Regions:
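Active-site loop of short-chain dehydrogenase/reductase
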Residues: 3-4, 80-81, 126-139, 172-175
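Conserved glycine-rich cofactor-binding loop
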Residues: 12-13
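Conserved glycine-rich Rossmann-like NAD(P)H-binding loop of the short-chain dehydrogenase/reductase
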Residues: 28-42
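Rossmann-fold cofactor-recognition segment
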Residues: 47-65
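Substrate-binding pocket helix/loop in short-chain dehydrogenase/reductase
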Residues: 95-96, 103-108
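A short, exposed helix-loop element centered on a Lys and neighboring polar residues
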Residues: 119-120, 164
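Catalytic loop of short-chain dehydrogenase/reductase
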Residues: 133-158, 164, 168-171
Length: 182
């Protein structure tokens, strides 16, 4: 079992991969996930070529059963998750009048609901250990809306509120929760 495991959900081509590289350089075993896990091959090869450890997976973070099983698998097969990062954004511009409820819900589901699922599931493991870090990446949309981004801003505000609530609840239990606007 690995000593330090960093989970990055939303390990995309930009920020998520950069986060994975930083934790890998600090000696963490990386567990990188995104909807299409095969797109993580380049990141995995890069981390391994620098003597790091990286596991890559496909995961739809909006599906509760999948997230629950995924977190259990990591804890059982790879090691205790020390740090969990939720980096899924869904930054899509939709005019409010033309935004269907389906589009709004999908953006919220990716940015906010998936964050809740990951946060809850990793907290179930971290709380008994009385240690761990949960990081939610945000955007300026987390603190103010912008024309054409009602769905994105609403979801980002929700993720920020989730992080604040989790920090107050889990902080006294040894879990650090942060919402980082990038």
């Amino acid at each position: 079992m690995e000593k330090k495991v960093a989970l990055i959900i939303g390990a995309g081509d930009s920020l998520g991969s950069s986060i994975a590289r930083v934790f890998a350089k600090d000696g963490f075993t990386i567990v990188a996930a995104r909807r299409n896990g095969s797109e993580l091959d380049k990141l995995k090869k890069e981390i391994v070529s620098q003597n790091g450890k990286c596991h890559s997976y496909s995961l739809d973070a909006r599906k509760e059963e999948d997230v629950t099983k995924f977190i259990e698998k990591i804890e059982k097969d790879i090691g205790q998750i020390s740090v969990a990062v939720y980096n899924i954004g869904a930054n899509i511009k939709y005019n409010i009048i033309e935004t269907t409820s389906q589009k709004y819900y999908k953006v919220w589901e990716m940015a906010a609901f998936g964050a809740f699922l990951m946060g809850r599931e990793v907290a179930k493991h971290m709380v008994p250990r009385k240690e761990g870090t949960i990081i939610f990446t945000g955007a300026t949309a987390s603190v103010r809306g912008k024309e054409g981004f009602a769905a994105f801003s609403g979801a980002k505000h929700a993720k920020r509120a989730l992080a604040q609530s989790m920090a107050r609840e889990l902080g006294p239990k040894g879990i650090h929760v942060a919402h980082v606007v990038i």
